[in-house]
Amino acid sequence: MSCAKPHILIIEPFYGGSHKQLIGALIEGLNHGDSEIFSLPAKKWHWRARTSALHFAQLIPRDHAFRVLFASSVLSLAELIGLRPDLAACRKIVYFHENQLIYPVREVKQRDCQYGFNEILSCLAADMVLFNSQFNCNSFLDNVQPFLNMQPDFKIKHIREQIEKKCQVLYFPVNFERFPIRKECVKGETAEDLDEKCIHLIWPHRWEHDKNPKLLVDTLCQLHERQVDFKVTICGESYQEIPEEFEHIQEKLGSKLVNFGHLEREEYLKTLLTGDIVISTADHEFFGVAMLEAAFCGCYPIAPNKLVYPEIYPKENLYNTSNALTKKLYNFCRMPRVFRKQRDQFFENFNFDRFSAKELVPKYLDIFNKHIADEQS
């Protein structure tokens, strides 16, 4: 692929978090000059989803040699191709980090159906549709028809069949090689010393309602009331105001809350290395990069028995109810030695390779190269 102009057009309307990480991993695997990125900062998601197609239609040069177009589902691909028909000849690949067909809203009337409809149109306009998990793929396809049935008349049929044949699951490539490896014992400390240490809980998610911060706060307050020893870090990105559930948590937990707020990357990694358990309380998760990152740094993952989590973690790491979560954490905090034995068993059996950038990025590049080869033949 040696050409003066790049062959691969990468578009990301929400260039931050896992969206940015994915593109970074792909760029590292591509030859210099093979690709060109067009992006917008990871702010104001709703406006990015509504208007980015028009923005990029004006920005992408018309004098190009693109043969592959790779974009996240935030972009309304059908709109872009309508505005820029010269890009229609590209092999168009849409990547779903999440899907809007099952995005949880507090009230049905709050749902803006246009986002989900744009995703369906993007799939119809695409040549290939990639999902970061089987759960993401299944939940999207299973809800295409129910979503379209919300239209009061002139029901649209047989759309799932058109999309399904384009779909493929390709896990998000986590660049574990950039992470420090946690040592079993800190130098100078014995196993007995570690048993005396209180359990460090970490919640590293976006501060938004779909991550269910209320369940986290309720659980931590119950542990605090039961007078078990623990400490907790609540980090993750906050794009808006602090959730109301977090407003008085510092007063409620006192010194047990050792970190509260977003941490810069270096400090974040250091904190993960001190953690014992990483918790998810999510109502909305299609992969869970933060959970895997924390697990790789030595934190034992505990997650709901739903969404993507049963696809990734063994049943011992999953809980079915809020009471089960509290009970599991209570027992671990009360008996650190029992916990650390179970954590050791988890890491002996868990395979991180199936989620690693080293294993997965070549599969993405094979897709790009195949499409370019098809165009050249």
Curated annotation (Swiss-Prot):
Gene3D superfamilies reported in the protein's UniProt record: Glycogen Phosphorylase B
An annotated Gene Ontology molecular function: mannosyltransferase activity
Domain of life: Eukaryota
Transmembrane segments: none
Leader peptide range in chain numbering: none
Alphabetic keyword roster: Glycosyltransferase, Transferase
InterPro entries named among the record's database cross-references: Glyco_trans_1 (IPR001296), GT-like_domain_containing_1 (IPR051862), QTMAN_N (IPR022701)
Pfam families: Glycos_transf_1, QTMAN_N
PANTHER family: GLYCOSYLTRANSFERASE-LIKE 1, GLYCOSYLTRANSFERASE-LIKE DOMAIN-CONTAINING PROTEIN 1
Descriptive protein name: tRNA-queuosine alpha-mannosyltransferase
Originating organism: Drosophila melanogaster (Fruit fly)
